[in-house]
């Protein structure tokens, strides 16, 4: 985002930062949170030593089973569907995958053509159903921008699922994480799915995303 994470910003958001920190359930999570905030302020790379984890560790926390109803927001060419299947022994109940970029979506369709119990949408995820400008030249990092010749439809997860269950939601929505969560309030309340979201696109997401999710639940 355009925000500068400095002492003034930290002071202004102290209450929210403290509230988000208090939601964390273990010492390592608190250390990660504290070190990342300090890294944002100072840019000191050594603060990231000892707080990074590999994908296997992250997925061990998610503890995915063989009967998941998976929602993939930003499925690119199908690589994250494959990643999901890798951790569920290739088994699942249902997959809903969204990809806004036309070229990527064609690859996704081809990649998943033999799969059953799956639906694909050429859409981006957002807080509500609308049309937004996308920078589609960024490949897997296609993102919402203020001005572009490429208009892309986006939709709320709640609208797409229409009350159907979700047990695991992964989002790669390039900075629209807050809006995406707003668009899945009903899904979160009803099914409390496991979430795999990014909190690095905007400085403030590290505290505002946990607070938003906690407030909904």
Can you say where each PLM-predicted feature lies in the sequence?
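Phosphate/nucleotide-binding beta-alpha loop and adjacent structural elements of enzyme active sites
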Residues: 1-217
